[in-house]
Amino acid sequence: MTTTLVSATIFDLSEVLCKGNKMLNYSTPSAGGCLLDRKAVGTPAGGGFPRRHSVTLPSSKFHQNQLLSSLKGEPAPSLSSRDSRFRDRSFSEGGERLLPTQKQPGSGQVNSSRYKTELCRPFEENGACKYGDKCQFAHGIHELRSLTRHPKYKTELCRTFHTIGFCPYGPRCHFIHNAEERRALAGGRDLSADRPRLQHSFSFAGFPSAAATAAATGLLDSPTSITPPPILSADDLLGSPTLPDGTNNPFAFSSQELASLFAPSMGLPGGGSPTTFLFRPMSESPHMFDSPPSPQDSLSDHEGYLSSSSSSHSGSDSPTLDNSRRLPIFSRLSISDD
């Protein structure tokens, strides 16, 4: 009986020494240590005395796996990051998990779209703010930023305000509450509408755009009017004070240049001036406005139409027909009848 007690005491002593060695050096595990670990889990000792205080080391399971892998001939697994984490006792696992989350807000701060868009009230009233440079409001006009609004901002009435007379958003509401906001919006629209627009003084052909605009507006104002605009002669256009000099206007051409440009395409004689041909009345243009030949029975109608058109063009001229002012087609037809 005495021998059994002595052997149990020696066994406990050796187990404590083995645990101390393992705590100092984890790199040299032994098979005996694994057996002692199994005893430490809760198995009874040799004399049948159960251990009251059993301690489970975090690396005991790792040593068991390493022993089994060595017996099977497999390479021993290396220490994982989780097992090596318990070696460092400077901070716990929970502190390590909270450490990166505490660094994130300080590293990068995401500002809202309203950052520094309003003045700081404590700074304006007292001249100081407890937040300092970290304040979300502007400390002075130089820090104030312009707020980007939606295109439909303050363009519709606030239904809540005009229904119950109260809006929880107050001045931050995106809809119109009173007439002052409507007037402010209208003033902003007037400023945007008063911006100067690009105006082209002359078109490519050299005609003033103001005259064309006036003619277009005149036609739009009187849509039932069929009176054509007055035909301007070349001398009137060239002598108009609205036209710039030839040196300043890159699209100004002389009569000789116009003759060289339009003579091949229009079949004009070399000595004739194209400007006088271009601005001749319709009744005096022999080749451009020739009508197709018509039957003999409709000559009276055409002559009547010719007389009415010539009287409307001449104005104060007599309604009698002149053979020199008649179109060539009617002249030929009258000659054939004779």
Curated annotation (Swiss-Prot):
Residues 185-338 are annotated as: Necessary for mRNA decay activation. Its main location: nucleus. Phosphorylated. Phosphorylated by RPS6KA1 at Ser-334 upon phorbol 12-myristate 13-acetate (PMA) treatment; this phosphorylation results in dissociation of the CCR4-NOT deadenylase complex and induces p38 MAPK-mediated stabilization of the low-density lipoprotein receptor LDLR mRNA. Phosphorylated by protein kinase AKT1 at Ser-92 and Ser-203 in response to insulin; these phosphorylations stabilize ZFP36L1, increase the association with 14-3-3 proteins and mediate ARE-containing mRNA stabilization. AKT1-mediated phosphorylation at Ser-92 does not impair ARE-containing RNA-binding. Ubiquitinated. Ubiquitination leads to proteasomal degradation, a process inhibited by phosphorylations at Ser-90, Ser-92 and Ser-203. One of its GO terms (molecular function) is mRNA 3'-UTR AU-rich region binding. Induction: Up-regulated during myogenic differentiation in a p38 MAPK-dependent manner. Up-regulated in response to fibroblast growth factor FGF4 in embryonic stem cells (ESCs) in a p38 MAPK-dependent manner. Up-regulated during high sodium diet-fed in the renal tubules. Up-regulated upon hypertonic stress condition with raffinose (at protein level). Up-regulated by parathyroid hormone (PTH) in calvarial osteoblasts. Up-regulated in response to adrenocorticotropic hormone (ACTH). Up-regulated in response to cAMP. Down-regulated by bone morphogenetic protein BMP2 treatment in calvarial osteoblasts. Residues 71-113, 273-338 are annotated as: Disordered. Zinc-finger RNA-binding protein that destabilizes several cytoplasmic AU-rich element (ARE)-containing mRNA transcripts by promoting their poly(A) tail removal or deadenylation, and hence provide a mechanism for attenuating protein synthesis. Acts as a 3'-untranslated region (UTR) ARE mRNA-binding adapter protein to communicate signaling events to the mRNA decay machinery. Functions by recruiting the CCR4-NOT deadenylating complex and components of the cytoplasmic RNA decay machinery to the bound ARE-containing mRNAs, and hence promotes ARE-mediated mRNA deadenylation and decay processes. This is mRNA decay activator protein ZFP36L1. The gene is Zfp36l1.
